Design a protein with these regions (language model features):
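A short, structured surface patch at a secondary-structure boundary
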Residues: 64-129, 177-179
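Short, glycine-rich, amphipathic interfacial segments at transmembrane boundaries or analogous
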Residues: 31-69, 129-156
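Positions in alpha-helical segments
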Residues: 3, 31, 71-75, 107, ...
Length: 189
């Protein structure tokens, strides 16, 4: 219901973003990436494309803000997390929730410890504690000689800790608090 309303309300913005992407670079406006959802079920996540076509074949899954695979408008879309809006489609399809641990790519899920597998016990979401902490992951990775190593050593452990915190604490009130904090970060910085 909420995702349906969100899609209707943001449809003019969707159209504007699609036009910007199509004018900026060749290829589809939407990117569909492989992610792992609740109970380890794979699904395709929708995002507005912020990278060159076939960028995932040119490098790893971690993306620094200065990654040469990024399109010209990627910075704008990522700054306001507009590239994430199509995930409302995933929410509508029941593959994701508004709040929950961000869905991971299969290669990272394969690295989960037994304890970390608890992350897969709840639906993945568009935002969570970890999203608030690493709001601009690309900026953290900017200038890194090895973005993947930086991600694995500096970002991933904290994301996992915060995702497990969400699994332990999740409730309607926690979800509401995370949504409000996410909106605050989006609009107030």
């Amino acid at each position: 219901m909420v995702s349906s309303i969100g899609l209707v309300v943001t449809s003019p913005l969707f159209l504007a973003i699609v036009i910007m992407i199509k004018r900026d670079s060749k290829g589809p406006a939407l990117y569909r990436g492989e992610r792992v959802g609740r109970s380890g079920k794979p699904f395709k996540i929708y995002k507005f494309r912020t990278m060159l076509v076939d960028a995932d074949k040119m490098g790893g899954p971690s993306t620094a803000a200065d990654d040469p695979r990024l399109t010209r408008i990627a910075g704008f879309l990522k700054k306001y997390q507009l590239d994430e809006l199509p995930q409302l489609i995933n929410v509508l399809k029941g593959e994701m929730s508004l709040v929950g641990p961000r869905p991971e790519v299969p290669m990272y899920v394969k690295m989960f410890t037994k304890e970390e597998e608890a992350i897969l016990s709840v639906p993945p979401g568009m935002t969570d504690y970890a999203s608030l902490w690493d709001f601009h992951e690309g900026e953290i990775l900017r200038g890194s000689a090895d973005p993947e190593k930086t991600y694995m050593e500096e970002i991933r452990p904290e994301k996992i800790r915060l995702q497990l915190k969400y699994v332990r604490e999740h409730s309607i009130w926690v979800d509401l608090k995370i949504i409000l904090k996410t909106l605050g970060k989006l609009f107030l910085g």
